[in-house]
């Protein structure tokens, strides 16, 4: 009853706080982390949105529409983007473009297994001497990388929602049925989770995470176009 009367932002904040309490993470009363300083050139390179292309006027046939399922939330989970994973002191990203194996599995259980396996191999250096690691993903076009050792908090929030939404879409029989309505509600929660990374008052927001998500989205779309 309470959830049905809350905004998507309030719901996603409640989910984040629940996961934080389950994992023993301190929940800030109010956000008190200022945005990192940037030069004018850095701001020009990072403070960008998604990718928009103007279509060429004309009449076309055999047109194909390509849609991504939960693109931005999937980027959060598979690229391990979270406030605490950005530019960690223990990892140094490689300059080469990462293989698919370097991404975190979207399935929550598979993601947990991946990080347990990385910890078992003990391939990480100390925070004083960071080591080059292929799993520490370099954000395309930015001077930012994500940690290969720590499983990001935001990824652990969105991955179960993505999985549940995919299950509901598989059960949908027609547009507007109960399963369609439920998956659509989860869709807006996932969209809000992305937006909250750049919201100045979000407890677990960080503008650098928002910029990293947008950078990966632009890279994926440009790769698809090519």
Where are the regions that the model predicts?
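Common nucleic-acid-contacting/processivity interface regions adjacent to the catalytic cores
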Residues: 1-83, 89-90, 180-219
């Amino acid at each position: 009853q309470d959830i049905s009367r809350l905004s998507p932002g309030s719901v996603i904040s409640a989910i984040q706080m629940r996961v934080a309490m389950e994992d023993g993470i301190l929940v800030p009363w109010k956000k008190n982390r200022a945005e990192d300083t940037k030069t004018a050139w850095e701001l020009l390179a990072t403070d960008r949105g998604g990718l928009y292309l103007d279509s060429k006027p004309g009449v076309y046939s055999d047109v194909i529409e390509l849609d991504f399922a939960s693109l931005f939330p999937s980027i959060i989970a598979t690229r391990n983007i979270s406030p605490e994973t950005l530019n960690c002191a223990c990892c140094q990203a490689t300059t080469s473009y990462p293989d698919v194996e370097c991404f975190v599995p979207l399935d929550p259980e598979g993601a947990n297994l991946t990080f347990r396996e990385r910890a078992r191999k003990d391939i990480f250096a100390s925070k004083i001497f960071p080591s080059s690691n292929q799993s520490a993903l370099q954000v395309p076009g930015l001077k930012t990388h994500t940690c290969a050792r720590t499983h990001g908090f935001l990824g652990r929030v969105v991955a179960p929602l993505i999985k549940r939404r995919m299950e509901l879409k598989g059960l949908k029989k027609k547009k507007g049925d109960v399963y369609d309505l439920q998956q659509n509600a989860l869709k807006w929660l996932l969209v809000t989770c992305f937006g909250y990374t750049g919201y100045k008052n979000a407890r677990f927001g960080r503008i650098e995470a928002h910029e990293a998500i947008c950078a990966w989205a632009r890279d994926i779309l440009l790769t698809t176009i090519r």
